[in-house]
């Protein structure tokens, strides 16, 4: 059974396909229209704007805080009663070095503020901080899926693995269309979305 959506789709497979197609097109627009350039790096309000932009054609909850508790495997994301306080604290975290930025990213992943689409929107948010603060972005096509997922799974306890992994994939090609497009495809691949190539939409 599919998540409730604006498209009236009942099949999970149909929804996954349309979600990938529509939100990847919106991700391309984000790059091309420079919307992010006007938004403050590292703030939850910016992540909200990214999430809303990507998913507003698909879900009513786009850009809105989740209203349910979420878990993945044995890991529980921030409980609803603490979510707003957690996000306020994340806003205040420093972000002047690579390590500080990744620590902030790890905390936002633990917060998992949305019902769906957290990983994809938060990776764009992370690159926006890296680009603004240290003049780098992650070349996600260089980050192995299994290594990334395992490092993120461990990151709440030990963040050294995700730091090493992402540091090795940093590039100063911050305005490269190719790096961005391949990065979106890879970001979606981590979540199991592989039907469409971003560059061809």
Label every PLM stretch briefly:
Residues 1-201:
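FIC/Doc superfamily catalytic core
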């Amino acid at each position: 059974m599919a998540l409730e959506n604006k498209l009236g789709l009942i099949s999970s497979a149909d929804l996954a396909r349309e979600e990938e197609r529509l939100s990847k097109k919106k991700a391309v627009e984000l790059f091309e229209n420079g919307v992010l350039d006007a938004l403050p790096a590292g703030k939850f309000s910016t992540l909200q704007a990214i999430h809303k932009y990507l998913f507003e054609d698909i879900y009513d909850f786009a850009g809105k805080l989740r209203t349910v508790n979420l878990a993945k495997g044995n890991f529980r994301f921030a409980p609803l009663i603490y979510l707003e306080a957690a996000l306020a604290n994340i806003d205040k975290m420093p972000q002047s070095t690579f390590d500080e930025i990744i620590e902030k990213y790890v905390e936002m992943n633990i917060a998992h503020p949305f019902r769906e689409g957290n990983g994809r929107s938060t990776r764009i948010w992370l690159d926006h901080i890296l680009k603004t603060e240290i003049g780098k972005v992650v070349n996600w096509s260089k980050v192995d899926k299994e290594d990334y997922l395992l490092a993120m799974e461990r990151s709440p306890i030990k963040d050294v693995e995700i730091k090493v992994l992402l540091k090795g994939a940093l590039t100063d090609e911050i305005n490269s269309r190719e790096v961005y497009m391949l990065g979106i495809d890879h970001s979606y691949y981590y979540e199991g979305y592989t039907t469409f190539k971003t560059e061809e939409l």
